[in-house]
Amino acid sequence: MYSAIRSLPLDGGHVGGDYHGPLDGTNLPGDACLVLTTDPKPRLRWTTELHERFVDAVTQLGGPDKATPKTIMRTMGVKGLTLYHLKSHLQKFRLGRQAGKESTENSKDASCVGESQDTGSSSTSSMRMAQQEQNEGYQVTEALRAQMEVQRRLHDQLEVQRRLQLRIEAQGKYLQSILEKACKAFDEQAATFAGLEAAREELSELAIKVSNSSQGTSVPYFDATKMMMMPSLSELAVAIDNKNNITTNCSVESSLTSITHGSSISAASMKKRQRGDNLGVGYESGWIMPSSTIG
């Protein structure tokens, strides 16, 4: 009678399986590869050699997914193996392969994720560095632009100040020329006014002198040439006597002479009278003319 035997593990160790063999734990008479345990219920022991033959058969059949227990049993050619042993061991082998594949894939995924994370972190760090450099470059550009703008405004202010200074200097020169002309004209007017003032003072002094001379004496001022034309007192006395004599003679002769001699006497008397008249006129003119020159 046979007992149940577990199959060997998938890593090449002993995999147990159900097997009905002799109770004393001896090997099966059909194949020396089969080994039974010495337990009260003997089981088939999957030795390393038996597991390698199983793996070779599965590989020859195209892998654990394509191999079946029946084809594996024919390929292995081991007597004493049953479909039950192969089915259980194939199932465990598939599970082990799948777990190993999943672990491999997981490890690959983990490595890929790590690599991607490393790549992502490196790319992120590189992007951050690039962005930081770009920001620094932008800040430098903005600083240079602001500095250029400040320099331009400063240059404009200096230009405005220079033009304003030129205008102030030109206006100062213009005002200075106007002041010089005004001072020159004022000096000329002052000189003219000084001359007029001097002339006015001279006229005032002359008027004062004339007024003082006219009020300080009662004798009128006569011209020397006119004073020479006036007759003396003796001349006036002689002229008066001559006039009286001529008048007396004329009256006596008029009474003594005849009518025939009247014309001659009249002529002579007229001549004498004319002479006396001339003397009288000269006397009067000589006396009156000085009176007309009183100033």
UniProtKB/Swiss-Prot annotation:
<keyword id="KW-0238">DNA-binding</keyword>
<dbReference type="GO" id="GO:0003700">
    <property type="term" value="F:DNA-binding transcription factor activity"/>
</dbReference>
<protein>
    <recommendedName>
        <fullName>Protein PHR1-LIKE 2</fullName>
    </recommendedName>
</protein>
<feature type="coiled-coil region">
    <location>
        <begin position="141"/>
        <end position="161"/>
    </location>
</feature>
<feature type="region of interest" description="Disordered">
    <location>
        <begin position="96"/>
        <end position="138"/>
    </location>
</feature>
<dbReference type="InterPro" id="IPR017930">
    <property type="entry name" value="Myb_dom"/>
</dbReference>
<dbReference type="GO" id="GO:0010628">
    <property type="term" value="P:positive regulation of gene expression"/>
</dbReference>
<dbReference type="GO" id="GO:0043565">
    <property type="term" value="F:sequence-specific DNA binding"/>
</dbReference>
<feature type="compositionally biased region" description="Polar residues">
    <location>
        <begin position="127"/>
        <end position="138"/>
    </location>
</feature>
<feature type="domain" description="HTH myb-type">
    <location>
        <begin position="38"/>
        <end position="98"/>
    </location>
</feature>
<feature type="DNA-binding region" description="H-T-H motif">
    <location>
        <begin position="69"/>
        <end position="94"/>
    </location>
</feature>
<comment type="subunit">
    <text>Homo- and heterodimers. Interacts with PHL3, but not with PHR1.</text>
</comment>
<feature type="compositionally biased region" description="Basic and acidic residues">
    <location>
        <begin position="99"/>
        <end position="108"/>
    </location>
</feature>
<comment type="similarity">
    <text>Belongs to the MYB-CC family.</text>
</comment>
<dbReference type="GO" id="GO:0000976">
    <property type="term" value="F:transcription cis-regulatory region binding"/>
</dbReference>
<keyword id="KW-0805">Transcription regulation</keyword>
<dbReference type="InterPro" id="IPR025756">
    <property type="entry name" value="Myb_CC_LHEQLE"/>
</dbReference>
<dbReference type="InterPro" id="IPR046955">
    <property type="entry name" value="PHR1-like"/>
</dbReference>
<dbReference type="GO" id="GO:0005634">
    <property type="term" value="C:nucleus"/>
</dbReference>
<dbReference type="InterPro" id="IPR009057">
    <property type="entry name" value="Homeodomain-like_sf"/>
</dbReference>
<keyword id="KW-0175">Coiled coil</keyword>
<dbReference type="InterPro" id="IPR006447">
    <property type="entry name" value="Myb_dom_plants"/>
</dbReference>
<keyword id="KW-0539">Nucleus</keyword>
<dbReference type="InterPro" id="IPR001005">
    <property type="entry name" value="SANT/Myb"/>
</dbReference>
<comment type="function">
    <text>Transcriptional activator. Acts redundantly with PHR1 as a key component of the central regulatory system controlling transcriptional responses to Pi starvation. Binds in a sequence-specific manner to phosphate starvation-regulated promoters.</text>
</comment>
<feature type="short sequence motif" description="LHEQLE">
    <location>
        <begin position="154"/>
        <end position="159"/>
    </location>
</feature>
<dbReference type="Pfam" id="PF00249">
    <property type="entry name" value="Myb_DNA-binding"/>
</dbReference>
<dbReference type="GO" id="GO:0016036">
    <property type="term" value="P:cellular response to phosphate starvation"/>
</dbReference>
<dbReference type="Pfam" id="PF14379">
    <property type="entry name" value="Myb_CC_LHEQLE"/>
</dbReference>
<dbReference type="GO" id="GO:0006355">
    <property type="term" value="P:regulation of DNA-templated transcription"/>
</dbReference>
<keyword id="KW-0804">Transcription</keyword>
